A protein has these predicted regions:
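A glycine- and small-aliphatic-rich helix-loop capping segment at beta-alpha/alpha-beta transitions
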Residues: 9, 68-69, 238-241
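Glycine/small-residue-rich loop that forms an oxyanion/phosphate-binding "nest" at active or ligand-binding sites
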Residues: 43-103
């Protein structure tokens, strides 16, 4: 829950006018009340898009406070986050709920960004590989190949988000490669190689270039740094400089 309306639109305006990405797509995920306003700000900006931070697992009905996929597509949203670490932690969203949210996304033409990642305890115990592998198997293995092909994945090392700890580029690459290898247990390798996997562990202007330079890191899910115009512009420029 960051920004008020004026801050959100000012951020979007400054970022979309401050860089012209040619090799990347920049997706803004503003809070629900500001989706339309931010969409209008970036309407004429090339390679900028917009998505929602969450959606309901239900198609519709008496679920006060929920926002359905159909509502989002009715205001021309393109993307939606599913399974963000904060939704998992604070709202107890488990595998079944996340699968239902993915289905709602697909049925209504939204492109989901499915988030996965391990907390500090799993990393410290050496169980991070099994933990993240199970997150993938328990949800994404239930998708059809066509659905998976429409999904973006974001790896969030929860232990490196807002803790002062930072995942090394090598650690990021290890986990991104793991995610691809797990997906290949079920899906065609050629298709899996084409799926974008974003890194979401405290990406900033200082580490973006080294992280984005890893073979299996296809971009970033940027948190706090996206609230600072110059930092976010530097991150976009780092992505643009790769390849």
């Amino acid at each position: 829950m960051n920004t008020i309306l004026a801050e959100a639109t000012d951020l979007a305006k400054a970022i979309s006018s401050g860089v012209n990405p040619e090799k990347s797509t920049v997706i803004f995920f503003p809070p629900f009340p500001f989706l339309q306003n931010v969409r209008e700000v970036i309407a004429n900006a090339s390679n900028f898009s917009i998505g929602a931070q969450n959606l309901s697992s239900k198609e519709g009905g008496a679920y006060t406070g929920e926002v359905s996929a159909k509502m989002l597509t009715s205001i021309d949203m393109e993307y939606v986050l599913v399974g963000h670490s904060e939704r998992r932690e604070y709202f107890n969203e488990g595998d079944n709920i996340l699968f239902e949210k993915l289905n709602q996304s697909f049925e209504n033409g939204l492109k989901p960004i499915f988030c996965c990642g391990e907390p500090l305890g799993e990393r410290s115990s050496g169980n991070h590989v099994q933990y993240v592998g199970d997150q993938i198997r328990n949800v994404l293995f239930l998708l059809t190949p066509q659905q998976l092909n429409s999904t973006i994945i974001a790896y969030e090392p929860i232990w490196a988000i807002g803790t002062g700890q930072t995942a090394s580029p090598e650690q990021a690459q290890e986990m991104h490669l793991l995610i691809r290898d797990v997906l290949k247990e079920k899906f065609e390798p050629e298709m899996v190689e084409s799926i974008s996997i974003l890194y979401g562990g405290s990406v900033n202007a200082g580490n973006a270039l080294s992280i984005f330079g890893q073979n299996d890191v296809d971009g970033g899910l940027v948190g706090g740094a996206s609230l600072k115009v110059n930092d976010f512009l530097d991150i976009i420029k780092a992505m643009e400089s790769i390849g």
